[in-house]
Amino acid sequence: MKHRIGRVEGEILRELTKILQKNIRDPRLSEVTITAVECMNDLSYATVYYSLLTEDANKEKEVQEGLEKAKGMMRHLLGQTLTVYKVPELIFKRDNSVKYGSKIDRLIAEVKKQDAERASK
């Protein structure tokens, strides 16, 4: 059963990415990248994780509103391509791992710069 859920999650991820690029014309969603999908065991709900390159709180709120508005159309288009009895209800959550990764990169670069300054003294 877990293998099937994993396949469905992968299929939802691929299809939602295509739908966002081709069918959704909301300018608020132009910078959104879908990073992961997790489904409940009965496939009734799918949590869709997305990332943004910006850290602006207003932009983040606009994107969340845009995703909520486009949720019905996304689910409808998913239903046309998925081979499951019932299309899962979509729940959108911000994926902070990308933001965390960029913060770590900045810290590493800062430490390297400090090491280089110490070595030159």
Swiss-Prot record:
GO terms for cellular component: cytosol. It is found in: Cytoplasm. The keyword Calcium does not apply. Pfam families: RBFA. PROSITE patterns: RBFA. InterPro entries: KH_dom-like_a/b (IPR015946), RbfA (IPR000238), RbfA_dom_sf (IPR023799), Ribosome-bd_factorA_CS (IPR020053). Gene3D superfamilies: 3.30.300.20. One of its GO terms (biological process) is maturation of SSU-rRNA. GO terms for molecular function: ribosomal small subunit binding. Belongs to the RbfA family. One of several proteins that assist in the late maturation steps of the functional core of the 30S ribosomal subunit. Associates with free 30S ribosomal subunits (but not with 30S subunits that are part of 70S ribosomes or polysomes). Required for efficient processing of 16S rRNA. May interact with the 5'-terminal helix region of 16S rRNA. This is Ribosome-binding factor A. The lineage of its organism: Bacteria, Bacillati, Bacillota, Bacilli, Lactobacillales. The gene is rbfA.
